[in-house]
């Protein structure tokens, strides 16, 4: 059996471990002349460059990312190819990034950095707390669950979730799955976290009308996809100080153009789609690869099937 692995995503230590663990498998790290591979362990960007019709023995694709909005899932499934993603790999680091963005605003970190630069000692009183607040998490998958766990530790009063199904994951106080419920979350929450996949239903989910529902002290943090928020409506909302601020790890487009007004707004904190960054990322991808590869070889159900 021959399997392609995107070597750079495994790390220089883990890739040899993979070869040692499965000595009967021929692992390749390029696809030139290897159209007979039976599995691809691959980044979305690499996959999108391939003509899958050439890979007549292909049975499984393991994406090395959680998001798959840029992958033609229907086409892959039409060819009876199994496809899985890496949804749990990035959840911890993304959840920590969300907390960092909230604390950036709550503890006035930009202001105090400016004070340091100017050698000024000028404290602010009555800085907001996460404690006793209401949090709305749009998306209660692996990222949402890690977020809820952390917000509980901060002593929040309520955690609302918005998701398709009605089941209530641990640490959530209430789950909504319709438009009325979404409006309740937006009207009630001090912190709105977007952790939804991008689909035709979630594109521009947070539009101008829904931004108007947010409390004046609300913070909105997007670690999902930029297109879930109507960016022009958000810019208008922020310029008019209708909400306290926005922490954005994702924008439309990416990279964010230098002439975008978002760069100059004092109530925005932008990071370059880097919330998942972690020294443990490659190890977690390696562990996921090991687990699903074992399942694939033994004809067991794969984890994180799309």
What residue spans do the PLM features occupy?
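C-terminal helix-to-coil terminal segments
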Residues: 84-97, 111, 252-306
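Conserved N-terminal Rossmann-fold NAD(P)-binding element of oxidoreductases
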Residues: 136-139
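Hydrophobic/small residue at the entry helix of a nucleotide-binding pocket
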Residues: 143
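An N-terminal-biased, well-structured beta-alpha scaffold segment characteristic
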Residues: 1-82, 207
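A short, aliphatic-rich alpha-helical micro-motif
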Residues: 33-35, 52-55, 130, 185-189, ...
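Rossmann-like adenosine-cofactor binding region
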Residues: 166-261
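Phosphate-binding beta-alpha-beta segment of Rossmann-like dinucleotide-binding domains, i.e.
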Residues: 81, 86-134, 146, 154, ...
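NAD(P)-binding Rossmann-fold cofactor-contacting core
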Residues: 154-171
């Amino acid at each position: 059996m021959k399997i392609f692995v995107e070597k750079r995503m495994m790390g220089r230590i883990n890739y040899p471990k993979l070869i040692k663990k499965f000595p009967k498998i021929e692992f390749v790290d390029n696809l030139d002349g290897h159209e007979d591979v039976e599995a691809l362990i691959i980044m979305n960007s690499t996959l999108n460059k391939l003509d899958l019709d050439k890979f007549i023995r292909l049975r499984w694709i393991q994406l090395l990312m959680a998001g798959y909005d840029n992958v033609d899932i229907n086409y892959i499934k039409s060819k009876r190819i199994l496809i899985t993603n890496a949804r749990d790999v990035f959840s911890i680091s993304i959840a920590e990034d969300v907390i960092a963005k909230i604390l950036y605003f709550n503890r006035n970190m930009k202001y105090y950095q400016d004070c340091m630069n100017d050698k000024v000692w000028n404290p602010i009183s009555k800085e907001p707390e996460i404690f006793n607040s209401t949090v709305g998490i749009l998306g209660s998958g692996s990222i949402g669950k890690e977020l809820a766990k952390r917000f509980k530790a901060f002593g929040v009063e309520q955690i609302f979730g918005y998701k398709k199904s009605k089941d209530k994951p641990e640490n959530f106080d209430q789950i909504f799955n319709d438009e009325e419920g979404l409006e309740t979350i937006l009207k009630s929450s001090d912190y709105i976290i977007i952790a939804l996949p991008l689909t035709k239903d979630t594109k521009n989910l947070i539009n101008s009308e829904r931004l108007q529902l947010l409390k004046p002290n609300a913070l909105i943090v997007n670690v999902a996809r930029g297109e879930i928020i109507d960016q022009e409506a958000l810019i208008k909302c922020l310029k008019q100080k209708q909400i306290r601020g926005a922490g954005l790890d994702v924008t439309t487009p990416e990279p964010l153009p230098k002439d975008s007004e978002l760069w100059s707004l004092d109530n925005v904190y932008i990071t370059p789609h880097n919330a998942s960054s972690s020294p443990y990322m490659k190890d977690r991808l390696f562990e996921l690869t090991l687990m699903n590869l074992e399942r694939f070889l033994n004809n067991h159900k794969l984890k994180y099937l799309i």
